[in-house]
Amino acid sequence: VNAYLVALEGGKRFASVGGTSAASPVVAGIVAQINDRRLSAGKPTLGWLNPALYKCGEGVFHDVTTGKTSGGIVGGFPAAKGWDAATGFGTVQYKPLAKCLVAN
């Protein structure tokens, strides 16, 4: 699924993109915004993100339970309830994530 719409030629054309190459910069932007909010609150930036994500818990993600990846040696991985190799914990929900990461 191509989840992002990218403007080209100054907004004259649009293209849909997906995958890690699209998602990684989006998540980097989310973390940058949260770090800015933390600095404004007199707190340090997050640093190593994994411990903070696990502290927030699965409630800051939308669990993707259908679909599967394709390719690879095993022919892809199915999405499932909870953590899975296809979607991890799922998609980030910005507001709950920001609330948790700015508060802690």
What would you call each of these model-derived segments?
Residues 1-104:
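Extracellular protease catalytic domains of secreted zymogens
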